Amino acid sequence: MADLKITWLGHAAFLLEAEKKLLIDPFISENPKAPCTPEELNPDIIAVTHGHRDHLGDTIEIGARTGCRIISIHEVANYIKSKGVFAEGMNKGGTVDLEGVTLTMTQALHSSSIDASGFSFDGGSPAGFVIGIGGHSIYHAGDTGIFGDMQLIGELYEPEIALLPIGSRFTMGIKEAVKAVELIEPQIVVPMHYNTFDVIKQDPEVFRKAVEAKVDTKVIILDPGESIEL
């Protein structure tokens, strides 16, 4: 049996399964590419990279139903708590140990408002996570543009797998994501945050060819619902 199973749920949502189940950015019910319903997900932990609707997603509903631990930047955690669901805040540079899963919050270049009831609430700063789970290190970049300290993330945490956005417009596009792979130097990269909507339509095969022409990193392209086992 694999030590770790990583399933792409479309957009930036992933389910990581080892001794515990970690759900990242559960944008499910409004995601046209989602391979499941929120009711089918029973995580031990949810990690939220930022407050935008396509990342906060179904966090509150899943948290209320399962009682799982929810981790996010301080301001997003406060918003979740205002809805009657317990959440735990952290900030960039910090690490939390969740009894077998570690989350280290990293920089991301993006924004993080929370839009609800016709108003925008302060969502703090966007973030990524370096995740320690099942004996492996995984970097989920969140929504981000490229930044030079991705190299430092690679040097400090040596992630085996990087989950990187390639959709452009709101995040890195293919050109920038290829350079990010060069900076991070993971063994495997999985593209995400593309083709959910026409406005972020990209051909992941173009990304694969560009990466493989530059570095030895293996590109794994998943369809929503497909998994990697390590």
Swiss-Prot record:
The keyword Hydrolase applies. It comes from the Archaea. Keywords: Hydrolase. Pfam families: Lactamase_B_2 (PF12706). InterPro entries: Metallo-B-lactamas (IPR001279), RibonucZ/Hydroxyglut_hydro (IPR036866), UPF0173 (IPR022877), UPF0173_UPF0282_UlaG_hydrolase (IPR050114). The keyword Hydrolase applies. GO terms for molecular function: hydrolase activity. Belongs to the UPF0173 family. HAMAP family: UPF0173. This is UPF0173 metal-dependent hydrolase MA_1308. It comes from Methanosarcina acetivorans (strain ATCC 35395 / DSM 2834 / JCM 12185 / C2A).
